[in-house]
């Protein structure tokens, strides 16, 4: 990124009205002063970003710079100033593709073919440049202008990733529920084919106005997707040509290795021989259904925006549901990203195990490195008093733990980790300690513990714990 003293955006661009808003950003119309050209400036408040969000911003800018295609919203400039980062994009004024379709007097299968062709052209360009979008959905399909026949533009590369060739790997759980592929839901390695699955979902909606996979219960929705459980019900599908259904089937193939790719899809007769293969019949039922589909999407978006604005939640905290919680697909148009939650939870379990190992070994030096100097605790040895600092624990390390040469083995049972933002976490678990008593008889102690961790300078430190049950020192 450029140095913080840079004022290039302020010097070269003039800002105008607001076009949209996100959690940490605002989009405003701007004009490049020396040429009078209009653009859209995405203004990100970098003071509010975590280190991980900074990395994501840089990743998005890098990816957008790579992509230059008539069906992709183009990034023209990326400028860092004090407290703000500016991404200068094409100004697209035609609104969402799906909103435009419902305003048309005439809409046919051939029109749907032309729409998906442009989407496939944008996806093909991404894939040829080693980019997987990961969040293809109606909200990210815009029109260049309000003119008839305006180009479809793919937008929002916030979840996009770079891949090497046909590399498949686990890049994290990311996307929007109704458009997620079976391999992502199975937590399998994935790559470019996830975008083709989403294209299949979009094409299905373009033809009948409702999605192939839908359920109020998110768990059941995911089961449908993993099973590839969609069909072409009568009467609405009776008037769709077999070639259109064939392309959908090739896109919604469960096995990603057998799924059609973007280059192949562009060669499909329903796309490249549109005038003779795709039906020209007006599809009023599709338009009517699509109106309802759009209305539901907008309502969900408005509810989420209101919650964010009035309750000051981050989108992330709203969307990371505890395991097993059912979620209605009322939020199925909302992007979710769960890239490394599992890894971060494992990190907390590991550092907790290291702390317990230091206790078992009577290693006060190792213990102090893992604990905050102002560590607070409730523990049986303190008789219900809140203890602060290390002196209380030092006594046990110096007079009991370090002098005990009995073999001790500790097991952590049922650890539950709650991630609290980027740099805090709470873990609750049962601790079983096995040891030999003074008579050499095997004994087991149990305690129930909760520990609060805080990450400072990249290092996790225990700032508070609460223990009930047995004291930790074998007797």
From Swiss-Prot:
PROSITE patterns: PROTEIN_KINASE_ATP (PS00107), PROTEIN_KINASE_DOM (PS50011), PROTEIN_KINASE_ST (PS00108)
Residues where ATP binds: 19-27, 42
Catalytic site positions: 135 (proton acceptor)
Pfam family of the protein (one): Pkinase
Phosphothreonine PTM sites in chain numbering: 286, 335
Superkingdom assignment: Eukaryota
Catalytic activities: L-seryl-[protein] + ATP = O-phospho-L-seryl-[protein] + ADP + H(+); L-threonyl-[protein] + ATP = O-phospho-L-threonyl-[protein] + ADP + H(+)
EC number: 2.7.11.17
UniProt key word Disulfide bond: no
SMART domains assigned to the protein according to its UniProt record, in alphabetical order: S_TKc (SM00220)
Keyword terms of this UniProt record: ATP-binding, Calmodulin-binding, Kinase, Nucleotide-binding, Phosphoprotein, Serine/threonine-protein kinase, Transferase
Phosphoserine carried by residues: 314, 317
InterPro entries named in the record: Ca/CaM-dep_prot_kinase-assoc, Kinase-like_dom_sf, NTF2-like_dom_sf, Prot_kinase_dom, Protein_kinase_ATP_BS, Ser/Thr_kinase_AS
PANTHER family: SERINE/THREONINE-PROTEIN KINASE (PTHR24347)
Family to which the UniProt record says this protein belongs: Belongs to the protein kinase superfamily. CAMK Ser/Thr protein kinase family. CaMK subfamily.
Description of how the protein assembles with itself and partners: CAMK2 is composed of four different chains: alpha, beta, gamma, and delta. The different isoforms assemble into homo- or heteromultimeric holoenzymes composed of 8 to 12 subunits.
Name of the protein in its database record: Calcium/calmodulin-dependent protein kinase type II delta chain
Gene source species: Xenopus laevis (African clawed frog)
